[in-house]
């Protein structure tokens, strides 16, 4: 059954205080490249930026990572897939304080009683009196323990290892422990810093290594968001793909299939029941994944929830996602007018397409400095489209271009001296008087 109008109005009224599901949030494990026994657990929405802070390249490092004799730090593992900052902080605290966490079964944490460590290089157990809280084996064992707990095992998280020796310790511990992880928790490897020299390793660490390649934005679902907006704003009648009832676009919470070729939409509650019915599980209240009732493609629940939360709560994030990036070197708020044709009656995208199809180069007579347009400035901005009087155009385009009549440097200096007193105390204008181009001639 679709949610009531009253409940939906409460959701829409609270859009200003409720943020959408974050694009990325993770808990991470740091290890000192100088002293491997020094480890640190934290959380962040941007691992590359946070790693740069810990290494002193940016401000904001944690107190425990400020010591220069322990830098640089490397990020050896992350746990991602949290649906909110609060959820990530909750898991971070439980990982740091597993012994006192209510989500951990201490009877199964045998490593704290035996004090067993696993050597990352050999993969063999080492008995000793080392502090169990600071050992890599103990931290990974606590991670495995939390992921097996009834609370965290339901979360759609992913464990990613960036170091082969740390992953080796993880695999050895899996062979020692009795419990297994939930099938919905994925464990992936991303080794890029192994098998290289120490110099190359430090250079990669300075650039965040493989951590810097993680997608921490909404770019992965950009086409999905655009497709949903187009489908729901089209105005046509849309029926639920599960219950076949008409969808009320203004009131119903609607889930759209993430596959580009499928136009299936359904009530969120109907689709959830459909997923859980296919799963045939009475213990789960929220599904992890399912199949589309129309195209039978695989759908991830978290991806669909991100799109819905962006549509209902994240108008700023959506605007930022589809905002056209300003070209490097172009002043803020000013587009690259010199290479953009603007036809009357066409939008910005349509005028760009029109210029490409017709091959027209429309010159914008906008000054690049306080002085009148000079030859060097014209050539630099227009890439050789504007040419010297009496000369030949640098391009092979046969379309007509407008070339202003240039003044000599002495004439320009005299004119500047006459107008300097009039402009004193006033802000310099960045526009050109149209009378300056009364004598402009069209070269055919």
Swiss-Prot record:
It is found in: Nucleus. Residues 323-355, 386-444 are annotated as: Disordered. Its EC number is 3.1.-.-. Coiled coil: none annotated. Keywords: DNA damage, DNA recombination, DNA repair, Endonuclease, Hydrolase, Metal-binding, Nuclease, Nucleus, Zinc, Zinc-finger. It comes from the Eukaryota. One of its GO terms (biological process) is double-strand break repair via homologous recombination. Gene3D superfamilies: GIY-YIG endonuclease, Zinc/RING finger domain, C3HC4 (zinc finger). It is an enzyme of class 3 (hydrolase). Its cofactor is a divalent metal cation. Its main location: nucleus. The keyword Cytoplasm does not apply. Catalytic subunit of the SLX1-SLX4 structure-specific endonuclease that resolves DNA secondary structures generated during DNA repair and recombination. Has endonuclease activity towards branched DNA substrates, introducing single-strand cuts in duplex DNA close to junctions with ss-DNA. Belongs to the SLX1 family. Forms a heterodimer with SLX4. This is Structure-specific endonuclease subunit SLX1. The gene is SLX1.
